[in-house]
Regions:
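Terminal-region recognition feature
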Residues: 1-235
Length: 235
């Protein structure tokens, strides 16, 4: 007998594309963190800079300035500009607190000129020697309105002739003559101012300024330079 060859056919199924795995989201937790809001940063009103600014602004609001550094061009710009602002027709008093080792005689002259302009406009110019008024600072102090020159009890004041410091050694004889003449003009001007501001004679002022002459508040009052000895407070 012939054997029957039976072949079995299997139906081929088309391969289906595999499903993409689903992304598993993390489980949500009930206690969500609240968004943290940045804290507002406020300026520290008690910092050194803030307090200094507050004090400076207070004094300026009372028409008061401090000459408490070397009397140089920077001080000139500050003091003269501020004093000029107060030549405003109000005739309100102006207060100058002083604690300075001195400095430029030209700057002192500019400040004194502005003080006299304030007086001419009807304002009294109070000068208050807090600790030390030396050299050019002593001239500014003395130029205050008579009767309005205060000194703290322990304050000192020092007068001497004007001088040039740190002059270049490489100078001609003509240059030295120019410096000498400038000093003579400045010293004559300051001597006249002190005679008018005090009870001293011209000879007494010249003798005082011929050297470094230091005075206590009481001694300066006897000379007619200080009017009142007390700690001064703004009205």
């Amino acid at each position: 007998m012939k054997s029957l060859n039976v072949t079995r056919t299997t139906s081929k199924k088309k391969a289906e594309p595999a499903e993409e795995p689903k992304k598993v989201e993390p489980a949500k937790t009930e206690d969500k963190k609240k968004e943290e809001k940045p804290e507002k940063q406020t300026a520290n009103m008690y910092s050194a800079d803030s307090m200094a600014s507050f004090v400076d602004n207070y004094f300026l609001s009372q028409r008061a300035i401090w000459i408490d550094t070397d009397i140089d061009t920077e001080m000139c710009s500050y003091a003269v500009r501020q004093l000029n602002l107060w030549i405003d027709g109000t005739k309100l008093p102006v207060y100058i607190f002083i604690n300075s080792p001195g400095g430029s005689m030209h700057v002192a002259s500019a400040i004194v000129d502005t003080m006299k302009a304030l007086e001419a406009a009807g304002s009294k110019v109070y000068t208050i020697n807090v600790a030390m008024a030396a050299s050019a600072a002593a001239i500014i102090y003395s130029a205050g309105t008579k009767g309005c020159r205060y000194s703290y009890p322990s304050a000192r004041i020092m007068f001497h002739q004007g001088r040039y410091i740190g002059i270049d050694a490489d100078l001609k004889a003509e240059d030295l003559e120019i410096y000498k003449r400038e000093l003579e003009i400045a010293n004559e001007m300051f001597t006249t101012l002190l005679v008018n501001a005090s009870g001293m004679t011209l000879a007494e002022v010249k003798a005082m300024m011929s050297k470094d002459s230091y005075f206590s508040a009481k001694e300066a009052k006897k000379l007619g330079i200080v009017d009142k000895i007390q700690v001064f407070t703004l009205p």
